[in-house]
Design a protein with these regions (language model features):
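Extended, C-terminal/distal alpha-helical "rod" segments
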Residues: 63, 67-69, 96, 138, ...
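Short amphipathic alpha-helical "interface-anchor" segments enriched in bulky aromatics
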Residues: 150, 231-248, 494-520
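Structured nucleic-acid-interacting core domains from mobile-element enzymes and related host factors
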Residues: 1-61, 558, 563-564
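Polyampholytic, low-complexity intrinsically disordered segments
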Residues: 377, 384-401, 407-411, 519-564
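Short, hydrophobic/aliphatic alpha-helical segments
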Residues: 20, 88, 214-221, 486-501
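Mobile genetic element proteins and their domesticated derivatives, centered on retroelements
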Residues: 34, 49, 82, 98-101, ...
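Conserved, non-catalytic sequence blocks in retroelement Pol enzymes and Pol-derived host proteins
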Residues: 36-39, 68-75, 100-101, 228, ...
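Histidine/cysteine- and/or acidic
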Residues: 52, 57-239, 545-553, 562-563
């Protein structure tokens, strides 16, 4: 681990060059950010960057991880830390979106960030202002992590049936022969959570469950107690319990190791029915959650279809009288998703990302909102208007840059001519300076015969172009967009920029999964500086993951020990 700091500085310099090349080619950067409290009792914020190259390559990289030294993590302070990263890398005015969780300080952070971007933009030279005219604004660039929203919806469903998980797992721990079932708990989930801890920590029950799984030829799965911040932990617990229902029933029916467990924590037939009803609800959220957290391909373009699909399924189940538990839970989840979906409809990013997808375009909105009137529906018209607005911004930027370069070239010619001896004047040579219709006759002769009867804009041509197959692979989608880059230059750029926006803050969360391994409970003295170096170098491919914990040795002062 020699010269760790020097390797970090070299890696950051290379990253900055890569980012600047992308920006100079007209590209924009999307960010994710999230906070984390480490085992070393320090708080951190991670910032990741995402973009697509002209070749369609999807880039996702850790930009920085910073220790939060201020005990009050308000929005202004978070914005200050975010700007430290973006200013140092020279990307502040190229940021188009920030994907974050729903914590209220993030609202202020993005408001402050928008103001900082506007201030920097106002101080730029004319050419740079033209290049960065599509600058960050919170209305269009604030992306709420949909995985967090899904979690809020599921937690609302669990709360509605009095089954939401307690923050403290010891709530479900029971001393031997002293197990109880609180009156305010819904028995099915309380019992399963309690059993998860019993089968995890008690040797005899665990051994009996494993043996019964072997006897019944059912794969043993660790039954892990869930946590409130991740609904999929509840889903995993529930799936494991239902897959091992027969072994669990058999063990609890015949066990003699704890009579209080037999009396209070053994699930009844009704309890198992409740768990199976809730498994139906979790199934609705499972695929969209997994899909939204991918890192190597676009995710935002599926947000609207997934929202509508979940809302419509929940709408069906909230009327299911024959499944009373599912009915209540689905109603609560439906209310949450509907509220957040309405908020998402007022922003442009999801619509633009969807319409730029060559498999979807506007056709998918006509399909999704068919019940509301299809192409005459309010949401279809809103989506089309959002797309046209963003196209207009990109088009104005392209025209502005082209006009600026033309004017600069013209000035250069004039300056060069002014420094030369005057040439003999040719009749009509300066006609273009005094005649506003100079060249019009030639233009008409060239174009009149092919002049269309209707306006044929790039948007019109894009929407008329047939959608490619819904089953097209990522490589096929990339190849298609590459082949159409000349025909649709503006929309191709929009597709690259909006296709890179992450639907969730999962990329930042993944950083902390790695950090959790680095800052182990027995290794809490590692300095924040070294945490930053190691995590960034891994993300940048300079420190490969094989150079893992065995090679990263920390001394008593929290410094990484260089190995022989």
């Amino acid at each position: 681990m020699k010269e760790l700091k020097a390797r970090y500085q070299t890696g950051e310099a290379q990253l900055k060059v890569k980012l600047q090349d992308h920006i100079n080619n007209g590209g924009r950067i999307s960010l994710t950010t999230d906070g984390w409290a480490g085992n070393n009792k320090l708080d951190y914020i991670a910032v990741t960057g995402h973009w697509q190259t002209k070749l369609g390559e999807h880039n996702s990289v850790l930009l920085d991880i910073i220790e939060l030294t201020n005990p009050v993590h308000d929005g202004r302070y978070l914005c200050k830390k975010l700007l430290e990263v973006t200013n140092r890398l020279g990307i502040t005015c190229a940021v188009m979106s920030v994907t974050r969780d729903n914590a209220s300080p993030n609202d202020t952070m993005l408001e402050e960030f928008e103001a900082a971007v506007a201030s920097q933009w106002g101080q730029m030279e004319e050419e740079d202002r033209l290049s960065f005219c599509c600058k960050f604004n919170r209305k269009d660039g604030d992306v709420r992590c949909c995985a967090h929203i899904y979690n809020i919806a599921v937690q609302a469903a669990l709360k509605a049936i009095k089954s939401n998980p307690n923050e403290h797992r010891h709530h479900y721990q029971h001393e031997a022969n002293r197990a109880i079932l609180p009156d305010d708990e819904r028995s099915a989930f309380f019992k399963i959570r309690s059993l998860a801890i019993i089968f995890k920590l008690r040797k005899l029950p665990r051994a009996q469950l494993k043996q019964m799984c072997t006897t019944l030829n059912i794969k043993f799965i660790d039954l892990m107690c869930d946590m409130p911040v991740r609904w999929n932990s509840t889903d995993n617990m529930l799936k494991a319990a239902l897959r091992m229902e027969k072994p669990i029933r058999a063990v609890l029916m015949n066990q003699e190791w704890d009579q209080s467990v037999r009396r209070h924590l053994t699930p009844t037939d009704e309890d198992w029915d409740i768990l199976k009803e809730m498994a139906v609800l979790f199934e609705i959220f499972r695929r969209p959650t997994v899909q939204s957290q991918a890192e190597c391909y676009p995710t935002l373009r599926n947000t609207i279809p997934n929202y509508l699909h979940m809302i419509r399924q929940l709408n069906v189940w909230q009327s299911a009288v024959e499944k009373p538990t599912l009915k209540i839970a689905a109603g609560a989840a439906h209310n949450v998703l509907t509220e957040y979906f309405k908020k998402s409809m007022s922003t442009r990013h999801s619509f633009v990302s969807t319409i730029c997808d060559p498999r979807y375009k506007l056709a998918v909105l006509a399909f999704l909102f068919d019940a509301e009137g299809g192409i005459t529906s309010t949401n279809y018209k809103k989506g089309k208007a959002h797309f046209q607005h963003v196209y207009s911004q990109y088009s104005q930027r392209a025209r502005g840059i082209a006009e600026y370069k033309r004017a600069q070239a013209e000035r250069a010619v004039i300056d060069a001519q002014g420094s030369l001896s005057p040439s003999p004047e040719v009749e009509g040579q300066e006609d273009w300076r005094i005649n506003p219709f100079h060249g019009f006759a030639e233009h008409m002769a060239q174009h009149q015969s092919v002049m269309p009867n209707v306006i044929n804009t790039e948007i019109d041509r894009w929407l008329r172009e047939p959608c490619i197959s819904l089953d097209s692979t990522l490589d096929e989608q990339r190849a298609y967009m590459q082949s159409k880059a000349y025909d649709f230059p503006i929309i191709s750029q929009m597709a690259r920029d909006y296709g890179a926006i992450p639907a969730t803050s999962a990329p930042s969360e993944r950083v902390f999964s790695v950090a959790g391994n680095l800052i182990a409970k027995k290794r809490t003295k590692i300095s924040s500086e070294n945490v930053r170096y190691v995590l960034c170098l891994r993300s940048w491919g300079i420190l490969v993951e094989a150079d893992d914990e065995e090679e990263i040795i920390i001394d008593d002062n929290g410094q990484i020990v260089e190995q022989e």
